Amino acid sequence: MAKKANPKAKTQKKRKVVVESNGEAHVTASFNNIIISLTNKKGDVVAWSSAGKMGFRGSKKNTPYAAQLAAEDASKVAHEAGMRKVKVYVKGPGNGRESAIRAVHNSGIEVTEIIDITPLPHNGCRPPKRRRV
C-alpha cells in the first residue's frame, strides 16, 4: 500500500526576523571561502552571502574581489530591510577581510565598530604541515 502524502509536511513557513536599525555584521574569512552574515542584536540572521554563493569557485573564492561582491549582496538586502548601523565582527585569516568591511560601508550601512574575534590558540593543537610549493 502506498502512503498518503501529507500536505503539511511539504510547505515550510518562512520565519520572520525582526530587523532593527542597529545590527551586527559577522565576516568569517577562512583560507578557502568568505561568509558574511548580517544579524540583528539577538543574533537572528537578516541577510547572508558568501563568495561561493556569488558564483566563485576554487581559489577565486578567497580573493578580496569575491569578498567585496558577497558583502555588497548581503548588505543590500539588509539595507532594504531597514538596517542602518552595524558592529563588524571579523573572524579568520582570509584575504577579503578589509574589502568586505569597505563594501558594507559603501552600500549605505554605517560601520560603528570593527572587532577582531579570530580564535588564537595558546599553543593547543599541532597545526597542519607547511606547504612546499
UniProtKB/Swiss-Prot annotation:
Question: Which InterPro entries does the UniProt record give?
Answer: Ribosomal_uS11, Ribosomal_uS11_bac-type, Ribosomal_uS11_CS, Ribosomal_uS11_sf
Quaternary structure, per UniProt, is: Part of the 30S ribosomal subunit. Interacts with proteins S7 and S18. Binds to IF-3.
GO terms (molecular function) for this protein are: rRNA binding; structural constituent of ribosome
Q: Name one Pfam family in it.
A: Ribosomal_S11
Taxonomy, superkingdom: Bacteria
Role, per record: Located on the platform of the 30S subunit, it bridges several disparate RNA helices of the 16S rRNA. Forms part of the Shine-Dalgarno cleft in the 70S ribosome.
| Signal peptide boundaries | none
GO CC, sorted alphabetically, is: ribonucleoprotein complex; ribosome
Say yes or no: keyword Ribonucleoprotein present.
yes
The protein's organism comes out as: Christiangramia forsetii (strain DSM 17595 / CGMCC 1.15422 / KT0803) (Gramella forsetii)
Positions of transmembrane segments: none
Q: Which family does it belong to?
A: Belongs to the universal ribosomal protein uS11 family.
Q: Name one GO biological process term.
A: translation
| Designated name of the protein | Small ribosomal subunit protein uS11
Question: Has UniProt tagged this entry with the keyword RNA-binding?
Answer: yes
HAMAP family from the UniProt entry: Ribosomal_uS11 (MF_01310)
Q: Which keywords has UniProt assigned to this entry? A: Ribonucleoprotein, Ribosomal protein, RNA-binding, rRNA-binding
Matching SUPFAM superfamilies = Translational machinery components
